[in-house]
A protein has these predicted regions:
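N-terminal pre-P-loop "Q-motif" helix
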Residues: 2-10, 171-191
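Conserved acetyl-CoA-binding loop-helix of GNAT-fold acetyltransferases
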Residues: 207-211, 460-482
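Conserved RecA-like ASCE P-loop NTPase motor core of nucleic-acid helicases/translocases
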Residues: 20-28, 38-52, 198, 218-230
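Conserved lysine of the Walker
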Residues: 32-33, 205
Length: 671
């Protein structure tokens, strides 16, 4: 085939130039598969084949692709005929060597946007796959506008355009690149203070951090949201590598000459400030684009707190040439570029709402909103882009300046569960898809019907750093109330800090829940708050806030921190307590969810209750209690604790307990 001969010549040119390209095969399944095999046979290479089904040799499923990160391959096939895993697609592109093709298999071009996407099961909260027309239309726009991508469609003539030659590329040798070497020297001679290195993926920032550790005369501690992501850093640091998780480091009195924080944007600013203040020198690294996270917003906020921050940026790719067509195309397709975040919005701000249909008529606006949200929120990923474009129940507000988006709010519909399902969630018997706050209100609250109420959760909110402290965030929340009707509440779930909570308080939210353990990656407790919009919403917020006040002392005793509520010293078992205790004793409500009412039960009961008292009053560990009570594991310990709660309830009022047990037992028969 003349096409394969031309591709063979182009592949040799790509290898000399140090670049990779995308080749799209769009058509019926058999046609795509046959042409992919012909490409594989014609062009020597590894030909990693990413597909849900093992269709070819060297196969890997999209979900298992993360196990291959850090390895390199020549040529790959990404099968997206039945579903497009955007994060896996981006990750695969990062594993390909210079001179490689990424062959993308797509459905028939004209039928693609109406075809259900199996990947939507991961992010749409729908029981069945849904069509994703907005993402497909966006991807089509990118593919047809990109002259460096090759589009080969069934029943269409294949034309291979001429690509002008580029400068020959010289691959890295393993020693620091000139850009790295210059930055390394600056860091090694840096006076006490804080330095931040930002880079897109594949620029060698982790290697740079490891090289710094290996060359300093003193000691260093590495921290990061996940130790598994520090493998490259550890490789270059050698014997000097020493990792401590953020929460463990904060709780310790460890000291070192340097603190190195890998992917610092993933750590909440309050925790990061505390860590940085303890070390004479700190190096922060963060990704400013890509599926691993975005860090420009973090950097702008951090600069405001540390005006003398030493800022560095690595721009030169290590494993391929600058301006690689594949990297550019993936960045455009998955909206990795957050350069707009560096432009200051000017003029008066106008709040307006928009829906997903704007992706069809005016895609520039939702694209800018997504870029602002991803620039401000580290954990925004390609999954969020797909959810924003096509998942049901998504709503958006923008705060528009004269030239740029100054703020954005993303809301998600929640609740509206049936009475039976809400009761089953409360009892710990069911956990349906989605409904983060609505389910938590039932599963961790006192009202079995809480999830029947209809709410709208704040999924993301962001204001450009240059336009913060002007009340724009509060205007966005007020706008959400204005544009939202026939709902019971707005809700939010966030990592608790005093500063964040003060913002939500100013917006009118009521605190209804605090988590009972810190998140390891953030060092924060999860908080949930409601802004009531109906009488039913107001009653729910008041009931759950009152419960939180009653539980405040027990939670503070457990967490070692006071809650931001006025505690109530009330040891009398209420009607809500009786119902919750029955839910623990006769259903599957968790021990710590029932912490407050169980503590009140222990104060009321005269029984020994060793499994409950040992855990909640004496703070014995599960392992210690299993040994003392001669139990063979945590499951049996929890069974014993439920039995003890039932014994205590029967001893207090057997008739009431019997009635509650019969009522709750009926809820498990929900289907």
């Amino acid at each position: 085939m003349a096409e394969l001969t031309a591709l063979h010549t182009l592949t040799a040119q790509m290898k000399r130039e140090g670049i990779r390209r995308l080749l799209v095969l769009s058509g019926e399944e058999g046609w795509c598969f046959d042409h992919a095999l012909k490409l594989r046979d014609a062009l020597p290479g590894d030909w990693l084949w990413i597909s849900p089904q093992p269709d070819a040799e060297n196969h890997c499923s999209p979900s298992a692709l993360q196990t291959l990160l850090g390895r390199e391959f020549r040529h790959a096939v990404f099968d997206a005929r039945h579903g497009f895993d955007a994060a896996a697609f981006a990750a695969l592109s990062g594993t390909l060597k210079a001179g490689s093709w990424l062959v993308l298999l797509l459905p028939v071009w004209e039928e693609w946007e109406n075809q259900p996407d199996a990947d939507s099961l991961r992010w749409s909260d729908c029981p069945d796959p849904i069509a994703t027309p907005h993402f497909v239309q966006h991807l089509k726009r990118v593919l047809t506008a990109n002259n460096d991508a090759i589009l080969w469609r069934q029943n269409q003539p294949f034309t291979l355009v001429h690509f002008a030659p580029r400068t020959d590329w010289h691959p890295a040798t393993g020693t620091p690149q000139p850009e790295q070497q210059q930055l390394l020297q600056q860091l090694l001679t840096m006076p006490p203070g804080v330095a931040a290195v930002t880079a897109a993926r594949g620029r060698g920032k982790s290697a740079l951090a490891g090289q710094l550790i290996s060359r300093i005369a003193g000691s260093a501690i590495v921290t990061a949201p996940a130790k598994a992501a520090t493998d490259v850093l550890a490789q270059f640091a050698g014997e000097k590598f020493r990792f401590i998780a953020p929460d463990a480091l904060l709780a310790s009195d460890e000291q070192a000459d340097w603190l190195v924080v890998d992917e610092a944007a993933a750590i909440p600013a309050p925790l990061l400030y505390q860590l940085v203040s303890r070390f004479p020198r700190t190096l922060l690294t963060t990704t400013v684009q890509g599926y691993e996270g975005t860090g420009r917003g973090f950097l702008l906020k951090f600069c405001a707190r540390f005006p003398h921050l030493h800022r560095f940026e690595l721009q030169q790719p290590i494993r391929w040439a600058q301006g690689c067509p594949l990297e550019k195309m993936v960045s455009e397709a998955l909206v990795f570029d957050d350069e707009n975040f560096t432009h200051t919005p000017q003029g008066n701000i106008v709040i307006s709402a928009f829906e997903q249909t704007l992706w069809r008529s005016e895609p520039e606006t939702p694209l800018k909103v997504y870029q602002l949200l991803s620039g401000a929120h580290y954990r925004t990923s390609p999954l969020d882009l797909r959810r924003m474009m096509d998942a049901p129940g998504q709503h958006f507000l923008q705060a528009a300046g004269e030239n740029e988006i100054a703020g954005a709010l993303w809301l998600v519909d929640e609740g509206g569960l049936s009475q039976e399902l809400s009761q089953a969630v409360w009892a710990g018997l069911r956990r349906p898809r989605g409904n983060l706050v609505a389910q938590s209100l039932a599963a961790h609250g006192s009202n079995p019907l809480a999830a029947t109420l209809r709410g709208r959760r704040v999924s993301r909110i962001a204001v450009h750093p240059a336009r913060q402290r002007e009340g724009t965030g509060q205007q966005l929340i007020a706008g959400a109330l204005q544009y939202t009707q026939d709902l019971d509440y707005l809700s939010v779930s966030f990592g608790y800090t005093g500063e964040l909570w003060r913002f939500w308080q100013r917006c009118g939210f009521v605190l209804v829940r605090m988590g009972n353990h810190r998140e390891a990656s953030s060092g924060c407790y999860t908080a949930m708050a409601l802004l009531p919009m109906s009488d039913a919403g107001k009653q729910l917020a008041e009931r759950e806030h009152y419960r939180l006040r009653r539980d405040a002392q027990a939670l503070a005793q457990w967490n070692g921190e006071m809650l931001p509520v006025d505690p109530l010293n009330d040891a009398v078992l209420s009607d809500d307590d009786w119902l919750e205790l029955a839910g623990f004793a006769f259903a599957h409500r968790p021990l710590l969810t029932s912490l407050g009412c169980l503590m009140r039960l222990l104060q009321t009961s005269e029984l020994a209750l060793p499994a409950l008292r040992g855990r909640l009053q004496k703070n014995a560990s599960d392992a210690q209690l299993c040994t003392t009570l001669k139990l063979s594991g945590r499951k049996l310990l929890l069974v014993r604790q439920r039995e003890e709660a039932a014994q205590a309830l029967f001893a207090l009022d057997d008739v009431r307990t019997e009635r509650l047990r019969d009522r709750i037992t009926q809820w498990q028969f929900f289907h």
